[in-house]
Amino acid sequence: MDKSNSSVVSEFVLLGLCSSQKLQLFYFCFFSVLYTVIVLGNLLIILTVTSDTSLHSPMYFLLGNLSFVDICQASFATPKMIADFLSAHETISFSGCIAQIFFIHLFTGGEMVLLVSMAYDRYVAICKPLYYVVIMSRRTCTVLVMISWAVSLVHTLSQLSFTVNLPFCGPNVVDSFFCDLPRVTKLACLDSYIIEILIVVNSGILSLSTFSLLVSSYIIILVTVWLKSSAAMAKAFSTLASHIAVVILFFGPCIFIYVWPFTISPLDKFLAIFYTVFTPVLNPIIYTLRNRDMKAAVRKIVNHYLRPRRISEMSLVVRTSFH
């Protein structure tokens, strides 16, 4: 393309999930409810884990960090998507687009590694119970969380380095509700085949390696429990089945979109909903409703803050502050 006749793209047009006005209103209500559930549900987990001393253990420490990542992951694009359902101009600036690419890879990569850390915690608890306290110390948990952020940051910066210096001087329409890296890359004013290869290698190493580690750890846990007791095996499988389902819903779309980006499909933007919205909704449900300790702690927190006497005291404080 002749640079003299080209113009630099300053913004991108996001086509969103659909163009139907009736569906736009439905999607606005639906995703508004889901986003509210994500924020409140994960904040409740963080509050419960930090305030209840009985939950100050490695498993719940990692769960609290997962809830924080889920809130961040749902917030990088969902609020704008919800606002765009009621907007006639669904655009995003170039810097805003780069920011979305940065945050989606940072939080998604962080969650992948964090899920492996949580699986490792369960592996040590079940397969090496006598050494659990020694292995899963507070320092170890902190290091695992730091590693998850470090790995995701390296992954993100390497992905961003492929995109930020690309020349965008022509088409600026992204058929998605956020700036999806494979789609944005194809809008560049040059042959992006080599860059797509680098994206595949980068994303493939992270997603496939973490997914393989997760599956391997689950298999080892199930085999270990099965060798001890068939009844315990059934209980462990019922617990892990829901975790595995969430892992598949999270990793499946990521692997399909980012490890196979050469053919862009309209289905991709709907698959992206799974790891940006549905997984952050399901994680609090899976890790709370199927855990007796968490349910008891959540019930205690809710009763403490929502009991009638507490509410009347709070309303009295509010009224007093206005006088």
From Swiss-Prot:
Q: Pfam families under this entry?
A: 7tm_4
Q: Name one GO cellular component term.
A: plasma membrane
Q: Which InterPro entries match?
A: GPCR_Rhodpsn, GPCR_Rhodpsn_7TM, Olfact_rcpt, Olfactory_Receptors
Q: Give this protein's Gene Ontology molecular function annotations.
A: G protein-coupled receptor activity; olfactory receptor activity
The intrachain disulfides are C97-C189
Keyword set for this entry?
Cell membrane, Disulfide bond, G-protein coupled receptor, Glycoprotein, Membrane, Olfaction, Receptor, Sensory transduction, Transducer, Transmembrane, Transmembrane helix
Q: Which CDD domains match?
A: 7tmA_OR4-like
Q: Which residues are glycosylated?
A: N5
Where in the cell does this protein reside? Cell membrane
In this entry, the parts of the chain located on the Extracellular side of the membrane are 1-25, 80-100, 159-195, 259-269
List residues in topological domain: Cytoplasmic: 50-57, 121-139, 220-235, 290-323
Hey, which family's this protein in?
A: Belongs to the G-protein coupled receptor 1 family.
Q: Give the function comment from the record.
A: Odorant receptor.
State the PANTHER family in the record.
OLFACTORY RECEPTOR
According to UniProt, the name of this protein is Olfactory receptor 4K5
